[in-house]
């Protein structure tokens, strides 16, 4: 490297260091080439040409995913000994003194984007209308009467889905397709940018859209990890619950069998001591007592029983007989 090149490189590095000291929040997008400074809710992009400081830097305002060029102060002549930090301050001064300048520029960008969006919608509507005009109803069936004209089918209007708002929380940000700051780079600088992975990543992540996508990815990964921690124990819990369910089912079946046995025993006892059975038993007992008392009388008349024994047995049987007859009368009351 020649002495003039070394001198230019030394001046360039000194200018960059002064810029970083003056603006502590400077983001180095591409090493020693492209820088981004947060400024009034936007970003001021500084692109250094290959032959800097012999050639002036290029300034851009990063507004709504676009890069708006900013000219150097009027009547300002850039020289090799010009101070990059001071020029950057001069670039910022008009916007700081009068915030309406930046607001006007933002409104212009919004109007431009709105017009582009409107043009795209109009083109889409035209394409839809052309598709409707080209539509024709199918021919009538052959067996349809000739004198009856087929009703002309009205084409159904194509319903367009409402476009999501640009600032919708669920809308995925668009990756920028144009990189104006790369146009001022030489082939050597571009090759160096491609070879240096850190510089390339810094340049890519300097775009808010890429950063937002990266943040969304990190949030989704964190959410997946959280859900994984919740769902991983679920199979074991399900197996345990299934085992408990089977045990409870077996216990239930055993209890059902016992309940059926007890129910059968209950029905048997209920049938045995039902009113009908009790009445039949009572009638049989009354009949037996009456028959036994008659037999005692016959035995006494035939001389087989003494008077004293006859009185005792006959009285006992008749007392039981009348007692059960009384119970039978009470049963029907």
Swiss-Prot record:
Where it mainly occurs, coarsely classed, is: cytoplasm
Region (Disordered) residue spans: 116-176
Keyword annotations of the record: Cytoplasm, Endosome, Membrane, Protein transport, Transport
Where in or outside the cell it occurs: the entry states: Cytoplasm; Endosome; Late endosome membrane
Give the compositionally biased regions (Low complexity): 116-134, 144-166
One GO cellular-component annotation of the UniProt record comes to: late endosome membrane
The residues covered by the VPS37 C-terminal domain are 256-333
Q: Does the keyword Ribonucleoprotein apply?
A: no
Membrane topology (UniProt): Peripheral membrane protein
**Does this UniProt record's set of keywords contain Cell membrane?**
no
Look up the record and give one Gene Ontology term from the biological process aspect: protein targeting to vacuole
InterPro entries listed in its UniProt record: ESCRT_assembly_dom, Helix_hairpin_bin_sf, Mod_r
Its assembly, as annotated, is:
Component of the ESCRT-I complex (endosomal sorting complex required for transport I).
Q: State the function annotated in the UniProt record.
A: Component of the ESCRT-I complex, a regulator of vesicular trafficking process.
Q: What family does the Swiss-Prot or TrEMBL record give for this protein?
A: Belongs to the VPS37 family.
Give the protein's recorded name.
Vacuolar protein sorting-associated protein 37
Per the UniProt record, the lineage of the source organism begins with: Eukaryota, Amoebozoa, Evosea, Eumycetozoa, Dictyostelia
């Amino acid at each position: 490297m020649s002495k003039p090149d070394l001198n230019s490189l030394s001046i360039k590095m000194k200018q960059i260091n002064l810029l970083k000291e003056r603006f502590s929040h400077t983001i180095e997008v591409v090493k020693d080439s492209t820088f981004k400074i947060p400024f009034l809710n936007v970003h001021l992009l500084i692109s250094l040409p290959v032959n800097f400081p012999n050639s002036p830097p290029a300034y851009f305002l990063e507004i709504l995913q676009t890069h708006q060029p900013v000219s150097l102060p009027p009547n300002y002549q850039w020289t090799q000994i010009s101070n990059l930090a001071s020029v950057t301050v001069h670039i910022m001064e008009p916007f700081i003194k009068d915030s309406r300048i930046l607001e006007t520029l933002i409104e212009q960008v919004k109007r431009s984007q709105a017009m582009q969006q409107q043009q795209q919608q109009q083109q889409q509507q035209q394409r839809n209308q052309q598709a409707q005009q080209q539509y024709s109803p199918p021919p009538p069936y052959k067996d349809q009467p000739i004198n009856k004209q087929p009703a002309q089918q009205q084409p159904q209007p194509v319903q367009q889905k409402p476009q999501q708002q640009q600032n919708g929380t669920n809308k995925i940000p668009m990756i920028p397709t144009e990189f104006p700051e790369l146009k001022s780079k030489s082939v050597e600088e571009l090759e160096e940018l491609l070879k240096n992975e850190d510089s390339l990543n810094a340049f890519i992540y300097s775009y808010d859209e890429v950063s937002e996508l990266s943040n969304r990815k990190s949030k989704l990964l964190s959410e997946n990890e959280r859900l994984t921690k919740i769902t991983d124990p679920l199979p074991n819990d399900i197996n345990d619950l299934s085992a408990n369910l089977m045990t409870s089912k077996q216990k239930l079946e055993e209890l059902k069998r016992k309940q059926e046995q007890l129910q059968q025993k209950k029905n048997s006892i209920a049938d045995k001591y039902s009113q009908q059975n009790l009445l039949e038993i009572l009638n049989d007992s009354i009949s037996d007592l009456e028959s036994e008392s008659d037999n005692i009388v016959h035995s006494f008349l035939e001389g087989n029983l003494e008077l004293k024994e006859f009185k005792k047995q006959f009285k006992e049987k008749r007392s039981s007989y009348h007692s059960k007859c009384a119970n039978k009368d009470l049963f029907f009351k």
